[in-house]
């Protein structure tokens, strides 16, 4: 076990509300609260760790009383929570509550759930073995609630002198559901009874024990913790509870065991050397919880009623006494071989220090006995003694080394380096002393030595008597000191290894710190992502609520419209007949309405088919017109392209014509000039003898030029004629194109007009068809109504005839029998008057039916008109409803997809987060066949579990899948 530490028992006080009987009795609420830790009863304050008022919820009580103990139990400490108080003060409600109600459950079901949740969040290298027991102390006998055949179990002590119930059933569990099933099973076997103060009074003390063992698969460290959850029976006054017979015997035993508990609390509070644990089996079982190795929380439950004021004060005094008790708690650790070795070495070092202290004190004592005065600087000093012991051990270790090693050390280390190493070793020794938590023990040793110095004379006398024994003991210690020289070498080597390991561990710590920082950054990122997803989910919830509200409003409006239709059809226009014909007439009206609806549906189907055929024909006509229009547009575009090409060609021809005319003019002029020059040259060659013919040549040249001009003029006129012809052709083509455009526009207008005419005719045809169908339907409905009315009238007429015949027959028989009595008896007269009244009523009914028939015929057109309006309204509502359903379906599908996406994201995050959580391994017990292979026992991840063949199956936290 680890080093112990002291802690006080925590005491919580809870007041229940006034119950119904106390309210009816007119009791006063005597408790007054001051802050969260003090309550006033009759002007006297009582202070506790926490005081809960009557309005405190179960969850708040659990958070303040029990939530911290879960962590302590899983870290290897023992824990106890028990409720104390008088009967009907709310102890069972505090400890158990409503086991399966999330708000009303008490400490036990909440702590069970928290244990598993905490395990899932722990290191994945941990394996857990969890087993539970449930028993009660009834009539001072221990009775197993999970096996009712075990009715008188005994209390024993283990090797550590810790009490336990021998033979009690222990069940291995691996999920909260299994624990709750065990609690339900045990609770069904517990003793309860009805008293004047409580309808479900516990007649026994119940103890639910959770034993948790954990093992680190890497370091092989094993921890164990026990959690006692105790529901005590309440103290009783027979005058108030009205106990009799067996209930009275139970009350005696309950009060006796609670009195023993009070004696134990008083003895512990007063610091008595004797504590009467064995006076009761309950105090024997709770011995470790009261003053032992356990973190204990007591919940004292009180009644605020003035009727129970004395019992409340007694309970508060009990809590105040219990609050002063101190427990010494330590971690329950099973040490490994390596840990035992380290502990052994540690104890050897302590033993060596104590021996040096004894030797120092003996030397000082001998000097005092010899009459010497020991100076203050030579008297015993703990720090000086430790330093000299360390130096002596070092000298012994150095002198005991081999010569070769000494030579090597002398050769390799100088005095300065040796001193430095010695200082370093001294620092390491000091650190080891600090880490081994020897401060407390050294202080205890100092206190003991001070006490010894105060009683020095008595100590001197005792040492004189035991001098011989001490001399022998000194000889033995000297021999042990010689033997421990070798151990000093081992210690030095261990220190060197420890220094190396320390460096390695420091490096590992740095690496782990960096890894932790990276994981922290990643966790912050994941948290931010989760926050954004939560915000998005909130938006989706708001959108969903808006859509739901909108759908609800639409449905409300639809229901309102349908209600108006029902009122218009069923209540106002149809008159309720009188007398016995009401049911028949309602049946007739309903049948008529159903037949109308059937015929209306048939008419609608026919009309839809006709509209479909008409629409098909219109579509065909529209397609033909569109094709014709497309052909016209194609021809127009072709003509436009042709006109454009001809215009371009005409422009090119005109340009070429101008160029040719210019070139011809220039060439003609050049030719004339050349010919004139040639003739002039020829004439010059003939010299002067031909001067007289110059005029003739000149005339000839002028004539030739004139002929060329005429030829050019003719060519120009012919080209101009050709240009005029081309322009005329262009004008004709433009006129033709304009006509085609106008024709196209006319065709388009004609097409639109035909289309509109077709639509108008279709609409009129539809209206005429609807009118014809409605008239036909009204005719058929009227015919059916007339037939129905005729049948009803015929039936009434036949009944009237039969009734008249029967009446005549009876009157005739009565006249024959009573022919002598002309006046007749009073009974016969009454009978005749009754029949006459019936006949008169039938006649009135017949007339009323005739009038109703006439009214119905008059109201038939109105009803048909209203029915048509109703049908149109129903169609509009159906279309709106269909559209709303489609929109709602789309929104629901989109919302479902978004929810699935968010669930998948959250599930993946949970899987990633649980991937490094703790494990609850399946315990292996002798005599059982494993559920899986012998080398790999089956496990269940993520809290899932199953029980097969009554074998305990455990958990590995952080998963969700069975191996």
UniProtKB/Swiss-Prot annotation:
Every copy of the Kinesin motor domain together lies at: 8-325
Q: Region Globular: start and end of each range? A: 915-963
Enumerate the UniProt keywords alphabetically. Acetylation, ATP-binding, Coiled coil, Cytoplasm, Cytoskeleton, Isopeptide bond, Lysosome, Membrane, Methylation, Microtubule, Motor protein, Nucleotide-binding, Phosphoprotein, Ubl conjugation
| Pfam families with a match to the protein in the record | Kinesin
Give residue numbers for the modification (N-acetylalanine).
2
Question: What GO biological process terms are annotated to this protein in UniProt?
Answer: anterograde axonal protein transport; cellular response to type II interferon; centrosome localization; cytoplasm organization; lysosome localization; microtubule-based process; mitochondrial transport; mitochondrion transport along microtubule
- Chain intervals for the UniProt region annotation (Disordered): 908-963
Q: Which InterPro entries match?
A: Kinesin-like_fam, Kinesin_motor_CS, Kinesin_motor_dom, Kinesin_motor_dom_sf, P-loop_NTPase
Phenotypic effect of disruption: Mice are embryonic lethal. They show perinuclear clustering of mitochondria and impaired lysosomal dispersion.
Coiled coil (residue ranges): 329-914
**Its GO CC terms?**
axon cytoplasm; centriolar satellite; ciliary rootlet; cytolytic granule membrane; cytoplasm; cytosol; endocytic vesicle; kinesin complex
Compartments in which it is found = Cytoplasm, Cytoskeleton; Cytolytic granule membrane; Lysosome membrane
User: Which positions bind ATP?
Assistant: 85-92
Q: Which residues carry this modification: Omega-N-methylarginine?
A: 956
An example Gene Ontology molecular-function term: ATP binding
- Membrane topology classification: Peripheral membrane protein
Q: What does this protein do?
A: Microtubule-dependent motor required for normal distribution of mitochondria and lysosomes. May be involved in the mechanisms of growth arrest induced by exposure to DNA-damaging drugs or by cellular senescence. Can induce formation of neurite-like membrane protrusions in non-neuronal cells in a ZFYVE27-dependent manner. Regulates centrosome and nuclear positioning during mitotic entry. During the G2 phase of the cell cycle in a BICD2-dependent manner, antagonizes dynein function and drives the separation of nuclei and centrosomes.
Family (UniProt)? Belongs to the TRAFAC class myosin-kinesin ATPase superfamily. Kinesin family. Kinesin subfamily.
Q: Quaternary state and partners of this protein?
A: Oligomer composed of two heavy chains and two light chains. Interacts with GRIP1 and PPP1R42. Interacts with SYBU. Interacts with JAKMIP1. Interacts with PLEKHM2. Interacts with ECPAS. Interacts with ZFYVE27. Found in a complex with OGT, RHOT1, RHOT2 and TRAK1. Interacts with APP (via cytoplasmic domain).
What does the domain comment read? Composed of three structural domains: a large globular N-terminal domain which is responsible for the motor activity of kinesin (it hydrolyzes ATP and binds microtubule), a central alpha-helical coiled coil domain that mediates the heavy chain dimerization; and a small globular C-terminal domain which interacts with other proteins (such as the kinesin light chains), vesicles and membranous organelles.
What is the official name of this protein in its record? Kinesin-1 heavy chain
Q: Origin organism of this chain?
A: Mus musculus
Tell me the classification of the organism that encodes this protein. Answer: Eukaryota, Metazoa, Chordata, Craniata, Vertebrata
């Amino acid at each position: 076990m680890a080093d112990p530490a002291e802690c006080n028992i925590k005491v919580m006080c809870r007041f229940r509300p006034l119950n119904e009987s106390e309210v009816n009795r007119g009791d006063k609420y005597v408790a007054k609260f001051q802050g969260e830790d003090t309550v006033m009863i009759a002007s006297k304050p009582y202070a506790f760790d926490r005081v809960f008022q009557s309005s405190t919820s179960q969850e708040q009580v659990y958070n303040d009383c029990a939530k911290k103990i879960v962590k302590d139990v899983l870290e290897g400490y023992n824990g106890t929570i028990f409720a104390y108080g008088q009967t009907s003060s709310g102890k069972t409600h505090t400890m158990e509550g409503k086991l399966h109600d999330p708000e009303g459950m008490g400490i036990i079901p909440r702590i069970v759930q928290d244990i598993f949740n905490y395990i899932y969040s722990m290191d994945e290298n941990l394996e857990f073995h969890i087993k539970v027991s449930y028993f009660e102390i009834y009539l001072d006998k221990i009775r197993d609630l999970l096996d009712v055949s075990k009715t008188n179990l005994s209390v024993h002590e283990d090797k550590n002198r810790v009490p336990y119930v021998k033979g009690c059933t222990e069940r291995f569990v691996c999920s909260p559901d299994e624990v709750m099933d065990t609690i339900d099973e045990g609770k069904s076997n517990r003793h309860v009874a009805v008293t004047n103060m409580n309808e479900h009074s516990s007649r026994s003390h119940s103890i639910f024990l959770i034993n948790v063992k954990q093992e680190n698969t890497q370091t092989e460290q094993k921890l164990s913790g026990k959690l006692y959850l105790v529901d005590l029976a309440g103290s009783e006054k027979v005058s108030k509870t009205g106990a009799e017979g067996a209930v009275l015997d139970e009350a005696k035993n309950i009060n006796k065991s609670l009195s023993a508990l009070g004696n134990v609390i008083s003895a512990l509070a007063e610091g008595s050397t004797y504590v009467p644990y064995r006076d009761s089996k309950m105090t024997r079982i709770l011995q470790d919880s009261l003053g032992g190795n356990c973190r204990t929380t007591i919940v004292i439950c009180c009644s605020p009623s003035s009727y129970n004021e004395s019992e409340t004060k007694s309970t508060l005094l009990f809590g105040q006494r219990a609050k002063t008790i101190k427990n010494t708690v330590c971690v329950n650790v099973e040490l490994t071989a390596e840990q035992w070795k380290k502990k052994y070495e540690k104890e050897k070092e302590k033993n060596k220090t104590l021996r040096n202290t004894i030797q120092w004190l003996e030397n000082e004592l001998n000097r005092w006995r010899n009459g010497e005065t020991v100076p203050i600087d030579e008297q015993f000093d703990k720090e000086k003694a430790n330093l000299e012991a360390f130096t002596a051990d070092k000298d012994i270790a150095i002198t005991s080394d081999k010569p070769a090693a000494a030579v090597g050390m002398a050769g390799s280390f100088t005095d300065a380096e040796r001193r430095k190493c010695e200082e370093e070793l001294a620092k390491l020794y000091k650190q080891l002393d600090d880490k081994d938590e020897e401060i407390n023990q050294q202080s205890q040793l100092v206190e003991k030595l001070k006490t010894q110095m105060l009683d020095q004379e008595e100590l001197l006398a005792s040492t004189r008597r035991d001098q011989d024994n001490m001399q022998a003991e000194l000889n033995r210690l000297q021999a042990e000191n010689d033997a421990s020289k070798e151990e000093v070498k081992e210690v030095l080597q261990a220190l060197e290894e420890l220094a190396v390991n320390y460096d390695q561990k420091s490096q590992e710590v740095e690496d782990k710190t960096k890894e932790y920082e990276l994981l922290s950054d990643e966790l912050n990122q994941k948290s931010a992502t989760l926050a954004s997803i939560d915000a998005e989910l909130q938006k989706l919830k708001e959108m969903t609520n808006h859509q739901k509200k909108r759908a609800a409003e639409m449905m409300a409006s639809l229901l309102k419209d349908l209600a108006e239709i029902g009122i218009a059809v069923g209540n106002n226009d149809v008159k309720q007949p009188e007398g016995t014909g009401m049911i028949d007439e309602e049946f007739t009206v309903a049948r008529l309405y159903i037949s109308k609806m059937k015929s209306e549906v048939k008419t609608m189907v026919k009309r839809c088919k006709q509209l479909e055929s008409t629409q098909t024909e219109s579509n065909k006509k529209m397609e033909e017109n569109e094709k014709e229009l497309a052909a016209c547009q194609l021809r127009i575009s072709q003509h436009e392209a042709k006109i454009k090409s001809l215009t371009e060609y005409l422009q090119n021809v005109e340009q070429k014509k101008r160029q040719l005319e210019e070139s011809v003019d220039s060439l003609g002029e050049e030719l004339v000039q050349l010919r004139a020059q040639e003739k002039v040259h020829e004439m010059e060659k003939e010299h002067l003898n031909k001067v007289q013919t110059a005029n003739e040549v000149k005339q000839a040249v002028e004539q030739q030029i004139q002929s060329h001009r005429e030829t050019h003029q003719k060519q120009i006129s012919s080209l101009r004629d050709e240009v005029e012809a081309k322009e005329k052709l262009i004008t004709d083509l433009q006129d033709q194109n304009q006509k085609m455009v106008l024709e196209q526009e006319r065709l388009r207008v004609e097409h639109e007009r035909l289309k509109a005419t077709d639509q108008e005719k279709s609409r009129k045809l539809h209206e005429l068809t609807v009118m014809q169908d409605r008239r036909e339907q009204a005719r058929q409905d009227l015919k059916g109504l007339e037939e129905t009315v005729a049948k009803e009238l015929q039936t009434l007429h036949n009944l009237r005839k039969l009734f008249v015949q029967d009446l005549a027959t009876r009157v005739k028989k009565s006249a024959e029998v009573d022919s002598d009595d002309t006046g007749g008896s009073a009974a016969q007269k009454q009978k005749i008057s009754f029949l006459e009244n019936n006949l008169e009523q039938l006649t009135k009914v017949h007339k009323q039916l005739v009038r109703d028939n006439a009214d119905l015929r008059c109201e038939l057109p109105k009803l048909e008109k209203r029915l048509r309006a109703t049908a149109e309204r129903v169609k509009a509502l159906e279309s709106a409803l269909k559209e709303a359903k489609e929109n709602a379906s789309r929104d629901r599908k989109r919302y479902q997809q978004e929810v699935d996406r968010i669930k998948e994201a959250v599930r993946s995050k949970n899987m990633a987060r649980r991937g490094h959580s703790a494990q609850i391994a399946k315990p292996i017990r002798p005599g059982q066949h494993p559920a899986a292979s012998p080398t790999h026992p089956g496990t269940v991840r993520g809290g899932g579990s199953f029980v097969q063949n009554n074998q305990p199956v455990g958990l590995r936290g952080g998963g969700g899948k069975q191996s």
